């Protein structure tokens, strides 16, 4: 494996890291960067290339764990009980938010992989996701009941979990759907974003590990440098992206991302159709 292919791995990791947790659809960006330009399937093969995308997604997940490490320590009860009387996000609220998409994902995984992963379906997801995000900003409550993630209710967690099911459609965007759902049920943009990232870790980790176990044979000595470079790149760029996004989301809200998604959909449409 030569240096050019390692550079391609770094670029793909960068795209994954920058877009996985922003509400812009990492799938749509992979179509443009990989399918249209870098073409990893040509030198890795179809299944190894798909395994590589799972590996770099794990890099992005690790970045979330690093950014929210204190939160996960609290959720797992590793600090002991807090005695200040303040409300705090509970592990059970996260589980409630995970159940709907988790169940549907397991039931329809094969159908989604076989029938919904196409350029046309991603285009539809990009546009419909953008419309949902615009609606969320238009109808957002002026004084959200949950200003922080510690103030969300079980009902809000469940509704966000139900809306997250939309992200099973490729191109819709997990963060786009869940942040929109959170805003529509009375969370601030930052609270919804925090809850989105926290929920993403177990559901994405589970899906990624299962996929890797199914495709372990593609971890060859030849592919290892490519996989490693992509993983590290995705991790580093996801760290940057997550921290930047969380600082700005309450100010810029969702409409700018929605406009960007529509432009991206137009670019893909012009190139492919």
Curated annotation (Swiss-Prot):
<keyword id="KW-0378">Hydrolase</keyword>
<comment type="function">
    <text>Catalyzes the dephosphorylation of undecaprenyl diphosphate (UPP). Confers resistance to bacitracin.</text>
</comment>
<keyword id="KW-0472">Membrane</keyword>
<dbReference type="GO" id="GO:0046677">
    <property type="term" value="P:response to antibiotic"/>
</dbReference>
<dbReference type="GO" id="GO:0005886">
    <property type="term" value="C:plasma membrane"/>
</dbReference>
<feature type="transmembrane region" description="Helical">
    <location>
        <begin position="3"/>
        <end position="23"/>
    </location>
</feature>
<dbReference type="GO" id="GO:0008360">
    <property type="term" value="P:regulation of cell shape"/>
</dbReference>
<dbReference type="InterPro" id="IPR003824">
    <property type="entry name" value="UppP"/>
</dbReference>
<feature type="transmembrane region" description="Helical">
    <location>
        <begin position="220"/>
        <end position="240"/>
    </location>
</feature>
<dbReference type="GO" id="GO:0009252">
    <property type="term" value="P:peptidoglycan biosynthetic process"/>
</dbReference>
<keyword id="KW-0573">Peptidoglycan synthesis</keyword>
<feature type="transmembrane region" description="Helical">
    <location>
        <begin position="116"/>
        <end position="136"/>
    </location>
</feature>
<keyword id="KW-1003">Cell membrane</keyword>
<dbReference type="GO" id="GO:0050380">
    <property type="term" value="F:undecaprenyl-diphosphatase activity"/>
</dbReference>
<keyword id="KW-1133">Transmembrane helix</keyword>
<feature type="transmembrane region" description="Helical">
    <location>
        <begin position="48"/>
        <end position="68"/>
    </location>
</feature>
<feature type="transmembrane region" description="Helical">
    <location>
        <begin position="152"/>
        <end position="172"/>
    </location>
</feature>
<keyword id="KW-0961">Cell wall biogenesis/degradation</keyword>
<comment type="similarity">
    <text>Belongs to the UppP family.</text>
</comment>
<keyword id="KW-0046">Antibiotic resistance</keyword>
<feature type="transmembrane region" description="Helical">
    <location>
        <begin position="92"/>
        <end position="112"/>
    </location>
</feature>
<protein>
    <recommendedName>
        <fullName>Undecaprenyl-diphosphatase</fullName>
        <ecNumber>3.6.1.27</ecNumber>
    </recommendedName>
</protein>
<keyword id="KW-0812">Transmembrane</keyword>
<keyword id="KW-0133">Cell shape</keyword>
<dbReference type="GO" id="GO:0071555">
    <property type="term" value="P:cell wall organization"/>
</dbReference>
<feature type="transmembrane region" description="Helical">
    <location>
        <begin position="193"/>
        <end position="213"/>
    </location>
</feature>
<feature type="transmembrane region" description="Helical">
    <location>
        <begin position="252"/>
        <end position="272"/>
    </location>
</feature>
<dbReference type="Pfam" id="PF02673">
    <property type="entry name" value="BacA"/>
</dbReference>
């Amino acid at each position: 494996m030569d240096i050019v292919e390692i550079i391609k791995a770094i670029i793909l990791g960068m795209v994954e890291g920058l877009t996985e947790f922003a509400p812009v659809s990492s799938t749509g960006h992979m179509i443009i960067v990989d399918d249209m330009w870098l073409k990893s399937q040509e030198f890795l093969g179809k299944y190894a290339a798909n395994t590589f995308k799972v590996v770099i997604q794990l890099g992005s997940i690790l970045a979330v764990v690093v950014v929210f490490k204190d939160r996960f320590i609290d959720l797992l009860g590793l600090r002991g009980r807090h005695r200040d009387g303040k409300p705090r996000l509970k592990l059970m609220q996260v589980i409630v938010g995970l159940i709907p998409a988790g169940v549907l994902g397991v039931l329809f995984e094969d159908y989604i992989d076989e029938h919904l992963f196409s350029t046309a379906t991603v285009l539809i997801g990009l546009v419909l996701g953008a419309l949902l995000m615009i609606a969320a900003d238009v109808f957002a409550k002026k004084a959200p009941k949950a200003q922080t993630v510690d103030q969300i209710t079980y009902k809000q967690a469940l509704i966000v979990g139900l809306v997250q099911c939309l992200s099973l459609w490729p191109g819709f965007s997990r963060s786009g759907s869940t942040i929109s759902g959170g805003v529509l049920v009375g969370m601030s943009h930052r609270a919804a974003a925090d809850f989105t990232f926290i929920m993403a870790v177990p559901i994405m980790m589970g899906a990624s590990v299962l996929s890797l176990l199914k495709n372990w044979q593609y971890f060859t000595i030849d592919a290892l440098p490519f996989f490693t470079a992509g993983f590290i790149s995705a991790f580093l760029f996801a760290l940057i992206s997550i921290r930047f996004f969380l600082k700005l989301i309450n100010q810029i809200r969702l409409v700018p991302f929605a406009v960007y998604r529509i432009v991206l959909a137009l670019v893909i449409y012009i190139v492919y159709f």
